[in-house]
């Protein structure tokens, strides 16, 4: 064993061994319990960032721990390779997106290997390869045949700069999330998958996920947005038109004072034909797109249409307004407004001097000042004919029944969830497998014509998708007829919705999945990824699993039993202001700091002498130039140090603050471990441990070892509090460093302890542990060594060391049976020669006993 810890030498050797032995290759074994651990695969952007490193370290720790516990572990890796950034990079670097993507994959794959992650590379998936998306295209055609896919013209958020459709979530304050260009509204035909057909299942099956974070489940519940209410039809006065609204508060029906419709509602567009002012308002409202989250805070604007609706119970004429807070694609595109009992309706009514009619009063009969705000709680019904005096439930049911009876209403369950628009007007995505015939009929591309391959050798001009710009690409035939291929491509969430399943049979060519393999490995036992995916990827992931189940590929209802959402990685961010008043962000690696006695930064200067402003710890990002390159850290400290810091610095779900001092601390700890094994190896134990022949000190140390094993096993296995597991090992290491190695049983206890520490640390720091395991004389590799088990007997305290004091000074230490009483301990203490000496001539006035630790005499 070499004296110095040299991660640069060890890590390369160990990684070479793993690659040659295919240590992490997963093979189906019906006689072995499987464990499928999956981290969300990365977009191949060019370089790994610390967020990736954290995600994959957590997954690797869990995988290695489960393998040591005898499970047949599958931990695959691949690349979510389609997407917009590749097009931007291709234009900037004058290359093709495919070339840029494949080069990035090669580079990032090497980065993952250098970090020592135990992936089964034989299962690697790259989603932009035709052999992968062929089956996605085929599955889409099957969904179309089942009636789960349709095409419709829909209003979309259009970014004129990127020339693409944006999801509502990608619109930030009216601008594109990527380039801030003002977003416009545009009507285009698009393909949709009917996720709404699965809304109820997606909602109720959340109860099958006890090991998913509550926060994610709450976000999905809110996103699906199930509500029970009544759909009500109003007649439009002096016409044969009707207007349908949906309400969850039929108890307020007698309080309706106006109706509001979306700018794109046919009724509004009709009314605007002879009203240029209204037409201008509608045009403005249509092109001021807001994300749904911003509806509550934006300024409410509206204009009267001049039309009136008739209240079906009171006969009252209610003005119909166009309002910017009503969305065409939610509900019916029209709402009944009750200003007395809805704050948004109230603000609008105040602004445009519309009346309000209170129909609910507080249940405790307290007064409510309607001149200040709406009363939005449930209460007792008033001013509502025969429903006066009833509570919420009775009024809800009474009015709903009456509306149904007179034929203008029906009870209905509604969902906020909308069907999934999967069309993208970009090039770098999987082509949508639909064909249009000369007569306008739309048909699915037959299996023998799949995959419809995206040409990779293209030139990007930054304006139009190459497959849209080339009229030849779309030309094809269908049963001898001339046909045109669809030139839109799939939303990249399509690829990431089923990749987890394809990992189970990645080379299978007969079908989308090999059911035998798939049902052995699925569901995923542990999924790891960021909470920012809660309502998009994680919902589509669950939806696709149900589609695969209904197509007969999988038997489970849910794709993953357990979900861990790791926190973000933060780092200090620094900037100075340039002469042109621009903030210039400086990398933390180029900053010299001065701190006060509490460790707070009081001065920061960069390499060029600029005094910097410290803007605090923020998420590592390119924009703030505060990303730390994992590669540099691995070269400086070794992969094990980086992994140890990542797992120790913070609980997995919390944000992690990158501190190089903490990385240095992790490195020092590994050096201490190395030095301790080296020291022990100079004179190792020659005989086996004999638990019956141990001294009190040896038993106490062994007890600490086994208590640590029990804690670490629980922390990693059940609680997933990896940082507390590491803290416990560090605490044990402090005791081991001070332990004696003077006799054979000392060394035997140390041998057991070091073998345990190395096994406990192996999932976290596998390279150093691989080497130390060999240096401790173990024949086989540690990769399949069983996890260390705590010995219950070793943890039992049969004896205690009690300190004896006389007038506050230690005069003796006695070892007594653990169950000895206070009186018996007093007698043992008084029998001690040194205690007798210091009590001689004094009278004991008081005794103090701290059970199992201290016995103190106060004497005068």
UniProtKB/Swiss-Prot annotation:
One of its GO terms (biological process) is leucyl-tRNA aminoacylation. A motif ('HIGH' region) lies at residues 42-52. Keywords: Aminoacyl-tRNA synthetase, ATP-binding, Cytoplasm, Ligase, Nucleotide-binding, Protein biosynthesis. It catalyses: tRNA(Leu) + L-leucine + ATP = L-leucyl-tRNA(Leu) + AMP + diphosphate. InterPro entries: aa-tRNA-synth_I_CS, aa-tRNA-synth_Ia, Leu-tRNA-ligase, Leu_tRNA-synth_edit, M/V/L/I-tRNA-synth_anticd-bd, Methionyl/Leucyl_tRNA_Synth, Rossmann-like_a/b/a_fold, tRNAsynth_Ia_anticodon-bd. GO terms for molecular function: aminoacyl-tRNA deacylase activity; ATP binding; leucine-tRNA ligase activity. ATP binds at residue 622. It is an enzyme of class 6 (ligase). The keyword Nucleotide-binding applies. GO terms for cellular component: cytosol. Its EC number is 6.1.1.4. PROSITE patterns: AA_TRNA_LIGASE_I. It is found in: Cytoplasm. A motif ('KMSKS' region) lies at residues 619-623. Pfam families: Anticodon_1 (PF08264), tRNA-synt_1 (PF00133), tRNA-synt_1_2 (PF13603), tRNA-synt_1g (PF09334). It comes from the Bacteria. NCBIfam families: leuS_bact. Belongs to the class-I aminoacyl-tRNA synthetase family. HAMAP family: Leu_tRNA_synth_B (MF_00049_B). This is Leucine--tRNA ligase. The gene is leuS.
């Amino acid at each position: 064993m070499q004296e110095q810890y040299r991660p640069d030498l060890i890590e390369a050797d160990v990684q070479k061994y793993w690659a040659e032995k295919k240590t992490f290759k997963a093979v189906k074994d019906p006689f072995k319990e499987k464990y499928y651990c999956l981290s969300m695969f990365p977009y191949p952007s060019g370089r790994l960032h610390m967020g990736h490193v954290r995600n994959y370290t957590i997954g690797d720790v869990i995988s290695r721990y489960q393998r040591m516990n005898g499970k047949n572990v599958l931990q695959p890796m691949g690349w979510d390779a389609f997407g917009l950034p590749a097009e931007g990079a291709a234009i900037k670097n004058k290359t093709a997106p495919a070339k840029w993507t494949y080069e990035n994959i090669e580079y990032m794959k090497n980065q993952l290997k250098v970090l020592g992650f135990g992936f089964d590379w034989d299962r690697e998936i790259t989603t932009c390869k035709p052999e992968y998306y062929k089956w996605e295209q085929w599955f889409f055609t099957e969904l179309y045949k089942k009636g789960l896919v349709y095409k419709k013209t829909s209003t979309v958020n259009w970014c004129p700069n990127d020339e693409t459709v944006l999801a509502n979530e990608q619109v930030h304050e009216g601008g594109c999330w990527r380039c801030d260009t003002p977003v416009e509204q545009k009507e285009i035909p698009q393909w949709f998958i009917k996720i709404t057909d699965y809304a109820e299942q997606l909602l109720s099956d959340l109860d099958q996920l006890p090991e998913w974070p509550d926060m994610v489940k709450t976000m999905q519940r809110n996103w699906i947005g199930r509500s029970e209410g009544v759909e009500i039809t109003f007649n439009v006065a002096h016409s044969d038109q009707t207007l349908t609204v949906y309400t969850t508060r039929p108890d307020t029906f007698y309080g309706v004072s106006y109706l509001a419709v979306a700018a794109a509602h046919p009724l509004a567009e009709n009314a605007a034909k002879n009203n240029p002012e209204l037409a201008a308002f509608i045009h403005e409202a249509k092109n001021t797109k807001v994300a749904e989250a911003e509806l509550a805070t934006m300024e409410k604007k509206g204009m009267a249409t001049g039309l009136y609706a008739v209240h079906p119970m009171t006969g009252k004429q209610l003005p119909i307004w166009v309002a910017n807070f009503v969305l065409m694609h939610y509900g019916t595109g029209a709402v009944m407004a009750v200003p007395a009992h809805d704050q948004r309706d109230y603000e609008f009514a105040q602004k445009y001097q519309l009346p309000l009619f209170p129909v609910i009063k507080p249940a405790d009969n307290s007064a409510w000042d309607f001149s200040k705000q709406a009363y939005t709680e449930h209460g007792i019904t008033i001013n509502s004919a025969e429903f006066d005096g009833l509570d919420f439930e009775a009024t809800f049911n009474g009015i709903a029944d009456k509306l149904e009876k007179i034929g203008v209403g029906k009870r209905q369950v509604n969902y906020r969830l909308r069907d999934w628009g999967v069309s993208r007007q970009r090039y770098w995505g999987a082509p949508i497998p639909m064909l249009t015939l000369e007569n306008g009929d739309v048909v699915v591309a037959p299996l023998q014509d799949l995959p419809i391959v995206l040409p990779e050798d293209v030139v990007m001009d930054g304006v139009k998708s190459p497959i849209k710009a080339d009229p030849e690409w779309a030309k094809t035939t269908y049963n001898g007829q001339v046909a045109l291929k669809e030139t839109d491509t799939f939303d990249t969430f399509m690829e990431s919705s089923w990749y987890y399943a394809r990992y189970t049979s990645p080379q299978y060519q007969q079908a989308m999945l090999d059911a035998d393999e798939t049902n052995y490995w699925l569901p995923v036992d542990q999924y790891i990824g960021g909470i920012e995916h809660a309502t998009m990827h994680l919902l589509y992931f669950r939806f696709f699993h149900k589609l695969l189940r209904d197509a007969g590929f999988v038997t489970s209802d849910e794709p993953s039993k357990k979900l861990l959402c790791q926190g973000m990685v933060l780092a200090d961010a620094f900037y100075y202001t340039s002469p042109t008043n621009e903030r210039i962000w400086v990398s933390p690696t180029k900053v010299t700091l001065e701190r006060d006695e509490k460790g707070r930064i009081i001065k920061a200067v960069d390499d060029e002498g600029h005094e910097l402003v410290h803007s605090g710890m923020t998420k590592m990002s390119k924009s703030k130039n505060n990303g730390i390159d994992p590669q540099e850290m691995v070269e400086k400290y070794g992969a094990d140090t980086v992994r140890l810091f990542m797992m120790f610095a913070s609980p997995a779900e919390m944000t992690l603050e990158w501190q190089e001092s903490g990385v240095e601390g992790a490195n020092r700890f590994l050096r201490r471990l190395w030095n301790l094994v080296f020291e022990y190896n100079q004179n190792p134990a020659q005989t086996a441990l004999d638990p019956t022949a141990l001294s009190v000190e040896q038993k106490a140390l062994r007890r600490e070892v086994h208590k640590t094993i029990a804690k670490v096993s629980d922390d990693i296995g059940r609680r997933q509090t990896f940082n507390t597991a590491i803290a416990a090992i560090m605490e044990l290491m402090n005791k081991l460093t001070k332990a004696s190695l003077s006799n054979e049983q000392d060394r035997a206890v140390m041998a057991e302890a070091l073998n345990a520490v190395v096994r406990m640390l192996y999932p976290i720091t596998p390279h150093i542990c691989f080497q130390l395991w060999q240096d401790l004389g173990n024949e086989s590799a540690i990769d399949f060594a069983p996890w260390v088990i705590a010995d219950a007997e070793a943890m039992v305290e049969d004896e205690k060391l009690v300190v004896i004091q006389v007038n506050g000074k230690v005069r003796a230490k006695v070892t007594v049976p653990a169950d000895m009483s206070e009186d018996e301990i007093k007698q043992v203490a008084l029998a001690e020669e040194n205690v007798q000496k210091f009590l001689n001539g004094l009278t004991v006035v008081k005794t103090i006993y701290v059970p199992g630790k201290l016995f103190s005499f106060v004497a005068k």
